Amino acid sequence: MITDKKQRVQFNDGFTIIESLVAIVIVGILMTAIAPVIILSVGNRVQARRVELATDAARNYVDGVRSRNIEAPKHVVLLDEIDRISTTPANKFNPQRLLFSSVAAPVSSGNLTCPTTPGNPYCQNDSTLSLYCFDVDGGGCSSRSVRDMIVQAFRSISPRGIRNASDADKSYLLGVRVYRADAFSEATSLVKSDSETKRTQASFTSGLGDHKAPMVELTTEISTNQTQLRDLCDRLGGCQ
């Protein structure tokens, strides 16, 4: 009986080559099945973080312009939202928000140039285009950065504001689009939403998203300490 027990122990001791190969194959199959899920999860986390950074950039820019810590964009859109032809009622409000939101997306030259001084973070700020940089990684604003954010900003101006610059600063619409800085690394046009298609990047996606599309788009009303109710009424066709 003692001899038989020893033989049984020796017979079951260790793994055979076939068992080891089967274990390797099973582990390989499991890794192959799990790898896409891991990659998708990491991609979604990265994209969600980018959308969060872009939202913060948009909020900080709007707050900075509203408090006048950031210079207002010089890219202006003429909006005459008063129907001066209709007489019932006179000066009826004529919304032109679609015209405002149809401002063209930036066209990249493939080499984004921004100042390195913190006092003037605008890459460009003129009557045709206003681009403001948020240097997220601290290495200077560059189209090679995967973390920096570029804000395209534009504001409305009324016909009266063209005649009197001080009136234009009393209240206006501010449009903001936030793009990834690496969207400007290629000499192609960026994209934007229109009245039929929303093009902003989703927080959850099967990849890293369309880097040419805006991360965030928003429109808000800007008023200052000089803004009065009369200014808003004049711009919108009067108050009842």
Predicted feature locations:
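N-terminal leader/signal peptides at the extreme start of proteins
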Residues: 1-15
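Aliphatic-rich helix starts adjacent to a transmembrane/signal segment
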Residues: 15-61
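Flexible, low-complexity segments enriched in proline/glycine/serine and punctuated by aromatic residues
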Residues: 34, 49-55, 59-240
